[in-house]
């Protein structure tokens, strides 16, 4: 049986989708490729070519910082210190933040305000040809007052983006958790899950959106029927929609794409719901969607949800953008599921995650290449996925310059992959968070843990940077 939403040059096995209520599994199983992949210029071994544009001072700092974050005990000590009560002491806090700012913060973040971040975007593009994704680095808001403050920062981000040439900037990023109170997002997610279990359950506040669940979606967070939203909760949700609408309008007027970041599964249904609502509202240009949602491929239901959302967008003739990532909340997902007596919603093995990412990537690239209103940002630090994506683009004859396909990595990480993809002719961006140093601490701790160990994401960069430094020293 064939599925028109899966890429045609693969063979898949899956079951059907029920038109009412929770669908059954449609996750594809890749059996074989029927076409050889053409060679593509994505050589990540020649450090002299990859890092030719990087000043020696930057190479020295980057090598030192990535080496420091590869030392497990150092990462553990630094994480403990930045999360400890010692940070409540003014002298200690000021000292730690000064050290962090001159090292890890400057390596992984773009600046303390929107103007500084825009300048960093320009300098990165002018020296390397890599674009920037601007994001205000606040993550969670507990009340409406904090949300009102945060939306002003996101609007400032759009205003800063408008000062940059379009060639320098890929997009701006918004976090729904920063513009809608966390308790409201959790309540909305609970109610959406309960409606998925019981389709006759009414949600009078619900607006038009795409599907946010599939047959594999984790529903264990909501074990009993939730109470309806209170009047105050409905008011807060309406305000959140207005905040999101305000930033979407500015992005639409400026023709600046807006990426909506993902969170963990306890909140993600509400985020997907709001993301798809805004896509329906603001994605009117078939060639350049404004709103992008994020799909986390480490979730077992990622493939199903992607196909269902795209199916509905095609029915409604609404273009859509997706940012595809692997995911960043593995530990918290596993702990929460275990505490409730359920299996983790994350794939059981890293290979399953790789397979899911690569399958979703290939499917999205095919959709984007056939003239449909799809745009894709392939966010990955995995070199195998980068090489596969480059080969797939060559196989499909994708126009690398039209913006329908783009690669991305975090600022300060996977530079070898970024430079290699850029040399191969692709649009490549760096995710560049900004904000006060103290607000960036949770983000920096996550980056440190990603880079720890000899087999970490930063291992290839460290190896190639050291070789390039040695080459330059020997050439003197």
UniProtKB/Swiss-Prot annotation:
Keyword Oxidoreductase: yes
Tissue: Expressed in the vascular tissue and in the abscission zone of petals, sepals, stamina, pistils and siliques. Not detected in petioles.
Subcellular location: Mitochondrion
InterPro entries the record matches: FAD-linked_oxidoreductase-like (IPR029041), Proline_DH_dom (IPR002872), Proline_oxidase (IPR015659)
Domain of life: Eukaryota
A molecular function (GO) term: proline dehydrogenase activity
SUPFAM superfamilies found in the cross-reference section: FAD-linked oxidoreductase (SSF51730)
Catalytic activity: L-proline + a quinone = (S)-1-pyrroline-5-carboxylate + a quinol + H(+)
Family annotation (Pfam families): Pro_dh
GO cellular component, one term: mitochondrion
Major subcellular location class: mitochondrion
Family: Belongs to the proline oxidase family.
Function noted in UniProt: Converts proline to delta-1-pyrroline-5-carboxylate.
Name this protein carries in UniProt: Proline dehydrogenase 2, mitochondrial
